[in-house]
């Protein structure tokens, strides 16, 4: 679970892997947790279920943007436009390159 950062996607290179991640996030959300401590977050991120929703929304947007993008630069641009305040740009850079087949992982 991430909080207001670009989500690390280099380890989930296949759509099926990201779908499994989304399913796990759905299970977590269904528990209606009062407190959620993201494993990676910007300072000041709320420690509640909004971090689950953020991670889920990010992964869905990444999936759609990756399908449309012709290369990592296009994917990075789309995600930065969607999440202009998100930190950890290196995560997006590596994840986009790996998922577009431009960097071995």
Model-derived segments and their meaning:
Residues 8-13, 62-66:
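Second-shell loop/turn segments in exported
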Residues 29-35, 42-105:
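Accessory terminal helices/loops
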């Amino acid at each position: 679970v991430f909080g207001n950062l670009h989500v690390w996607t280099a380890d989930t290179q296949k759509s099926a892997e990201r779908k499994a991640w989304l399913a796990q996030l759905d299970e977590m959300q269904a528990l209606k947790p009062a407190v959620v401590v993201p494993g990676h977050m910007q300072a000041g991120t709320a420690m509640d279920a909004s971090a689950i929703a953020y991670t889920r929304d990010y992964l869905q947007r990444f999936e759609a943007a990756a399908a449309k993008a012709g290369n990592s630069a296009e994917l990075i641009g789309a995600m930065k436009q969607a999440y202009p305040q998100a930190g950890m740009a290196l995560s997006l850079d590596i994840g986009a390159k790996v998922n577009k087949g431009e960097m071995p992982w």
